[in-house]
């Protein structure tokens, strides 16, 4: 989940430029996505998340022996190049889809929508990865791992958003 979780902060850090919706409105006369979803953010967020995943793959065999008493080390050495790309890219797609629906509901850019704001990237990462590499996803995200992710991720998400806000990369701390 680390590549997926870090894709969004990297998108915010390196984003800007041309909005994905090109500034266009939907048929409800509201922006399709808003200025916060840009091609540069999508590309660099996905790329940075993928590079973090690659770093995990390279380090896992060296770290696995030290975690033998805590987790099954074999879990750290199985990887998928498809998931390496789909997890961060899917995370950002999940955020984009959520933004589309927030605009339809009348939420402005930066407005808080609890739970959806914390788990949109998880849903996007899992859905895209399930569509393109279901075996890897189901082998790595058992029901208990999925529950742990759903419970733990919101805490990390809020912490990263507060950090982004304090660094001046986010307009709001959520």
Swiss-Prot record:
It is a multi-pass membrane protein. GO terms for biological process: glycerophospholipid biosynthetic process. Pfam families: CarS-like. GO terms for cellular component: plasma membrane. The keyword Transferase applies. It is found in: Cell membrane. InterPro entries: CarS, CarS_archaea. Its main location: membrane. Its EC number is 2.7.7.67. Keywords: Cell membrane, Lipid biosynthesis, Lipid metabolism, Magnesium, Membrane, Phospholipid biosynthesis, Phospholipid metabolism, Transferase, Transmembrane, Transmembrane helix. It comes from the Archaea. Its cofactor is Mg(2+). It catalyses: 2,3-bis-O-(geranylgeranyl)-sn-glycerol 1-phosphate + CTP + H(+) = CDP-2,3-bis-O-(geranylgeranyl)-sn-glycerol + diphosphate. The keyword Lipoprotein does not apply. The chain crosses the membrane at residues 51-71, 74-94, 112-132, 136-156. Pathway: Membrane lipid metabolism; glycerophospholipid metabolism. It is an enzyme of class 2 (transferase). One of its GO terms (molecular function) is CDP-2,3-bis-(O-geranylgeranyl)-sn-glycerol synthase activity. Catalyzes the formation of CDP-2,3-bis-(O-geranylgeranyl)-sn-glycerol (CDP-archaeol) from 2,3-bis-(O-geranylgeranyl)-sn-glycerol 1-phosphate (DGGGP) and CTP. This reaction is the third ether-bond-formation step in the biosynthesis of archaeal membrane lipids. Belongs to the CDP-archaeol synthase family. This is CDP-archaeol synthase. It comes from Methanocella arvoryzae (strain DSM 22066 / NBRC 105507 / MRE50).
């Amino acid at each position: 989940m680390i590549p997926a979780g870090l894709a969004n902060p990297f998108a915010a850090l390196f984003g800007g430029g041309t909005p994905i919706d090109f500034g266009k409105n939907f048929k409800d006369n509201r922006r399709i996505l808003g200025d916060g979803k840009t091609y540069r953010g999508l590309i660099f967020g996905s790329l940075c998340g993928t590079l973090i995943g690659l770093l995990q793959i390279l380090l896992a065999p060296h770290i696995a022996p030290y975690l033998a008493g805590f987790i099954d080390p074999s879990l750290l050495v199985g990887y998928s190049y498809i998931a390496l790309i789909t997890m961060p890219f899917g995370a950002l797609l999940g955020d984009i889809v959520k933004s589309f629906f927030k605009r339809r509901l009348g939420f402005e850019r930066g407005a808080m929508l609890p739970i959806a704001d914390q788990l949109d990237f998880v849903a996007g990462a899992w859905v895209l990865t399930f569509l393109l590499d279901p075996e890897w996803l189901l082998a790595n995200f058992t029901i208990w791992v999925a529950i742990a992710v759903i419970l733990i991720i919101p805490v990390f998400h809020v912490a990263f958003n507060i950090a982004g806000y304090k660094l001046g990369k986010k307009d709001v701390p959520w």
